[in-house]
A protein has these predicted regions:
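Active-site metal-binding loops of divalent metal-dependent hydrolases
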Residues: 66-67, 103, 151, 201
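Short catalytic/ligand-binding loop motif for oxyanion handling, primarily in non-cytosolic enzymes
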Residues: 17-18, 51, 69-72, 104-108, ...
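N-terminal beta1-alpha1 cap of cysteine-dependent amidohydrolase-like domains
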Residues: 1-84, 92, 222-265
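Cysteine-nucleophile active-site neighborhood
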Residues: 67-134, 145
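A structural signal for short, well-ordered beta-strand segments and their strand-loop junctions
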Residues: 10, 44, 97-100, 148, ...
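C-terminal and late-domain segments of enzyme folds
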Residues: 163-265
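Pocket-forming structural segment of enzyme catalytic cores
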Residues: 108-206
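Glycine-rich, phosphate-binding/catalytic loops in enzymes
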Residues: 25-28, 77-81, 113-116, 164-165, ...
Length: 265
């Protein structure tokens, strides 16, 4: 990949909803650019809101998280065009990183598992357990921590389809020995160049401290989950929080791999 100017497309899947993810992604790219001493051009496409789709001439693509059901939009035009784009990206081997809602849509479209509602909504700073070694996880522990905010999950992996695509499950959600429920899939390597995660690796410690202490956010979590849940979340956001390690490594590792065109480890 040419390093003069690296063109990055961000597919905005927020559908106009307030979020901190977009700015966090831009901050990661800016910090990475400065560290690598490269130039980047970042273009945002309002995919869900306006049906905007990037051309195939970008060097890499990041598709954001977003609200709502990944099952209810199958017949919507933006969703149809988005899944066509996913298939095209696999064919032309462009680096793609899918976050949360984007990951769920990809799993649904490629039939890699069952996409369904969780028994209850998940929110918090929670452990992710890796299953394989991969350059994406460089700098992270075998179990690392990430922000989760989701009502949906992917379970019951379709092993035949995974094998057919040469895709691989990379991580599962936290172990819950006391809960007789299947652990959800947290990351998949769809191909040599396409990765997807169920969590939010773009979340920075500083932004999360502000977000979870905002009166509206605090009240919403307390009303839905209770005071103890909110307190547990903010307790994870101290100076030694492992969330910053995830922020500093995972998406930058994807950018490094895209820049260097490194082979699968």
């Amino acid at each position: 990949m040419a390093t003069a100017t690296i063109r990055i497309a961000i597919l905005d899947m927020y559908d106009g909803s307030p979020n901190i993810g977009m700015q966090c992604i831009k901050n990661i790219i800016m910090e990475w650019q400065q560290r690598k001493r490269v130039q980047t051009e970042v273009v945002v496409f309002n995919t869900r809101g306006n049906g905007e789709m990037p051309a195939h001439d970008f060097d890499l693509y990041i598709s954001t998280g977003g609200p709502g059901s990944p099952l209810d939009t199958v017949q919507e035009e933006w969703d149809i065009q988005y899944t066509i784009w996913l298939e095209n990206m696999l064919v032309i081997h462009k680096p793609v990183f899918l976050i949360c809602h984007s990951f769920q849509i990809a799993c649904r479209h490629f039939n890699l598992g069952t996409v369904c509602l969780r028994k209850s909504k998940q929110v918090g700073i929670l452990p992710v357990h890796t299953l394989i070694e991969d350059a994406l996880f460089t700098g992270l522990q075998e179990t690392f921590y990430a922000l989760e905010s989701r009502a949906y999950q992917i379970i019951a992996p379709n092993d035949d389809k995974l094998k057919q695509m040469n895709a691989q499950i990379m991580a599962l959600e936290k172990m819950r020995p006391q809960v007789p429920l299947e652990r959800a899939i947290m990351a998949i390597r769809f191909s040599e160049n396409m990765y997807g995660v169920q969590f939010h690796p773009e979340a920075s410690l500083a932004d999360l401290i502000i977000y979870f202490n905002e009166p509206k956010t605090k009240q919403s979590i307390m009303e839905e989950f209770g005071v103890e849940k909110w307190q547990k979340i903010v307790d994870h956001l101290d100076a030694d929080s492992p969330i910053q390690t995830t922020y500093s490594n995972l998406i930058p590792n994807f950018l490094d791999k895209a820049l260097n065109n490194e082979p699968r480890s």
